[in-house]
Amino acid sequence: MINGLGRMKNWLWIIGLFFVLSLHAEDGHRFWLRMERNALPADVSLSESTERTATLDIASRELKDFWKGEGRVLLRVSKDGVMRDGFTICRKGLDVELSSASDNGVLYAAYDLLRRQQAGDLLSDGVAVTERPSYDIRILNHWDNPDGTVERGYAGRSIWKWDELPETVSPLYEEYARANASVGINAVVLNNVNAKPQMLSTGMLRKVAVIAEVLRPYGIRTYLSVNFASPKALGELSTADPLDEDVQRWWKKKAKEIYRLIPDFGGFLVKANSEGEPGPQDYGRTHADGANMLADVLAPYGGLVMWRAFVYQAESPDRACQAYEEFMPFDGQFRDNVIVQVKNGPIDFQPREPFSPLFGAMQHTQVMPEFQITQEYLGQSIHTVFLATMWKDCLDAETYRVGGGTVADVTQHRVGIHSRSAVAGVAN
């Protein structure tokens, strides 16, 4: 009897072991899109006035695969629809209509409808809901290097396989694009702000163009971090002085090359004269001189310059004041297609610090907040931290500028005729 019980326990252990081995942990690849694919496609169609595009094909495919509703889903792009990537979802009986002024807006509406389905928050008959993003540009900054390493990266190596591109295109690129589009991200910077000059070589730009082609149908524009000394570092000029005519011609030629390969290229992110990175101050010039030179080069193509205000240098007597002291004298002197990108705090993504005074002080320059998603000072890959509360504290903080306004208010406001509002997140 005792031997029989022992054998039974052994078998139970073996069965339990096989059961454990058959379990599969969530690997994160499905993101929030953990939906079972339909056995038969849902009824999804475009309105008669809506032309088929690659972006609308994605919206249609997502709904056909995962929408469980019994009625028809109609996708409509209309010039009188909600602007700035906004959308309206309207329920009429069993049918649902998704409308926007842009293809991207319809794609965001499709993901919002699926989110509501997942959350059990479906609209009642006759009810319509309209959503508008607060910022024109919702951009991720990746600090990825050409060799595959990631600065302040705590989630493995870079997904950009530069050594395989342009011949081999990883399926992760589209998976990445889908995840971003599903939460409204519409722009990405592919490489580290401590940029290698080689990122602007013709060979690398051809590889960037392949990634941009994958991201484009998901409504995502591609940006690059650039090394300000690239004309000199690549051995083509003896200087990188932004007021030198040869330097200006070099950048114009490079911009022409980029837009020939990537017609919807977003623009440049620049870290200059900070932590040893080169910049216009190396030649006695100002941040405005450097940013405006690049802005003039990109302006004919609709490109932007995001010029970082993180200008920490060890010789500064007060690190918390340095960005304010270097940028405030030039408020109002930046081109309309320049956005000064300001870290949420005056130091460096600290767990607790006040918001940067530049948000309220620079009233004549477009500024944008830069938040850190990768947890450099908050446990890195070890701890799970709910970051949204910290960001909300910053965005909701009153700046006490003339006329009042929170950080969110002043950064969502467009300063110039051609300005665009933006918010950045530094991601693994």
Region spans (language model):
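N-terminal secretory signal peptides that target proteins for export/translocation
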Residues: 1-8
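Sec-dependent signal peptide recognition
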Residues: 9-16
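Acidic, contiguous N-terminal accessory segments
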Residues: 14, 25-93, 124-126
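Feature activates predominantly on carbohydrate-active enzymes
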Residues: 27, 62, 83-86, 91-269, ...
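A cross-domain feature marking catalytic cores of carbohydrate-active enzymes
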Residues: 142-144, 192, 224-228, 272, ...
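Active-site-proximal beta-alpha loop/turn segments in soluble metabolic enzymes
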Residues: 196-197, 232-241, 271-282, 310, ...
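Substrate-binding groove of N-acetylhexosamine-processing glycoside hydrolases
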Residues: 260, 278, 285-428
